């Protein structure tokens, strides 16, 4: 086991604060509409240019072990805020730095760190309640566009694209971000349910231009096992042929003679069919088959419920207006399922989301809700170079998270004003002793810091602007993008309540931990031994004989 350095008290805290400052100073230059870029070196390929706080934070690793501990703790603030709210990482870092900086002064003056922490917690709880009070729900797509634009560093086109996507697929719909092929951003909307399984044989293709299978008003057969024997399928195929409509088979797999017979019938024009594998794996596959059954008004043919393929009738089959199958995707448009049954299924999945413990499960369940309730929108990000594309894509993803947060918990005035106004709820607070009062003061000071930093990054005098904004009331604030004072909500400078709340809570949580730290243990740096001398050129003796 390697030897450890154990550092106590002020010496440990001072080193950790140095680390906090190095990381926070690198991150906070990106805050606000006039925030600067940070260039990140890559071990291969060109450098990455970013204005995303969490991307900058993740890159920072300091040589000094104690400084690095401080930096890593603040990095945790940024990444936790990003995970919970999807945005607000820079604001959280600025708040954490301020709470640590102010708090350390009081700790150095001999105040009790535990009481400081209690004061900080009390102030944060009061501020969060105040933020919830002033929060307004997002009602219009204009507000959604404004939130998206602010989060994407005042890029209005990104905000508009996201608002348009939400209009098309609903607030529950899936919106994904992909690399575009042109210079302009594009929005592609897939209505209906899409899942990532394509045709099992290219011989099913009936639209050679698009290389897809198009089935108009088809029946849908859902089976949870493999189909390899054509004899099992014959009864249902005959019934479908009599009805004169196409058939899509969704099963675990269709292989051997069953697939060959379907292909031959398709080529000869006897029966228009297509087959795809069921989406997902294991229990998720069963659940998704059930989703498709409810969407199309059919039944999953499973031995568990006493149904077999040879006894299946047309009543067991689902129906849809149109189905399009590509090489990798299948889209079911306008399923014939009962609206009440679909709504019931969505409620059931939402209940599962509430109980889900892992982020992965939650994400997959949300996708299922979106596929049943709305549709899928793809924002294709356009840019001139790959470096610009990466940077823009990161901003679009941030904006997307911010708009989802705004839909979830509502909006507050942006530009650091919501936190500044929430100070009113704290200023009357008193703790149980002077040390707790000091903790409350720490938060009061920290809550004006985001506005100060936004103004500094815009090249203005922070104290003058903060004083003027404090004189105003309500939504009155400073719009750093235009350099004007006024009603920020009317100007479209909005922040999601969830982002502001999460940033403050996470910053206070980690900063309090640091204030109550009294000992740091780190590995002793290894002494680097001097490199060995290179081997000499032997056999060079006897120079005299050469003279």
Swiss-Prot record:
SUPFAM superfamilies: GroEL apical domain-like, GroEL equatorial domain-like, GroEL-intermediate domain like
Enzyme Commission number(s) of this protein: 5.6.1.7
Binding site for ATP: 30-33, 51, 87-91, 415, 479-481, 495
Coiled coil segments of this chain: none
Superkingdom per UniProt: Bacteria
GO molecular function, one term: ATP binding
CDD domains the UniProt entry points to: GroEL
Top EC class for this record: isomerase
Catalytic activity line of the entry: ATP + H2O + a folded polypeptide = ADP + phosphate + an unfolded polypeptide
Subcellular localization: Cytoplasm
Stored InterPro entries: Chaperonin_Cpn60_CS, Cpn60/GroEL, Cpn60/GroEL/TCP-1, GroEL-like_apical_dom_sf, GROEL-like_equatorial_sf, TCP-1-like_intermed_sf
Keywords: ATP-binding, Chaperone, Cytoplasm, Isomerase, Nucleotide-binding
Assembly and binders: Forms a cylinder of 14 subunits composed of two heptameric rings stacked back-to-back. Interacts with the co-chaperonin GroES.
Main function: Together with its co-chaperonin GroES, plays an essential role in assisting protein folding. The GroEL-GroES system forms a nano-cage that allows encapsulation of the non-native substrate proteins and provides a physical environment optimized to promote and accelerate protein folding.
Similarity remark: Belongs to the chaperonin (HSP60) family.
Protein name listed in UniProt: Chaperonin GroEL
Originating organism: Cupriavidus pinatubonensis (strain JMP 134 / LMG 1197)
Lineage: Bacteria, Pseudomonadati, Pseudomonadota, Betaproteobacteria, Burkholderiales
